[in-house]
Amino acid sequence: MINLNIFNILKYKLVRIIESNPTLNLLIYNNVRFFKFLLPHEKDYLGMKKICKNDVNATIIDVGANLGISTMGFREMGFKNNIYIYEPNYEIYKKYLKPLVKTYKKLHINNFALGDKNHTKNFYIPYYKGKPIHYFGSFNRSYIVNSIKITFPKLLLDIEIKKRKVRIQKFDSLKSK
């Protein structure tokens, strides 16, 4: 137990270092499926293991799944639940989420955002040196600018923010599969 606690402390310190450098962050997180020892990537998930029901008949919803790191974390912790994944960014959906279905069972991936009505909306993605910093993707452009000012203040002038149209589905209109 002590060795596991020491490992987790070191792991979460390493994750903070990774998250402080955009190039390293993208390199590691884009390839996290090869670094499963980093999962779950947040210690809060260990608490969720104590309070969430690990049941094949229960459901987990991963909204704004991005790379699917939370979903991978749940699977690496042993959760067998159905997981419904929602990610509006098509590039991430295609490159990172679709392959997860081959690795993990009972995943249901969807390439749209959830909302209170069916429509399309602008989705903003910052790019650094031509690479998307997808974890800052947002419907709110100023949120991205403020997040970068806080997280990577010296890089703000090197960031290009691109706009994409994405589909939003009304949450209560989704039909169960």
Indicate where each model-derived feature is located:
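Phosphate/nucleotide-binding beta-alpha loop and adjacent structural elements of enzyme active sites
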Residues: 2-177
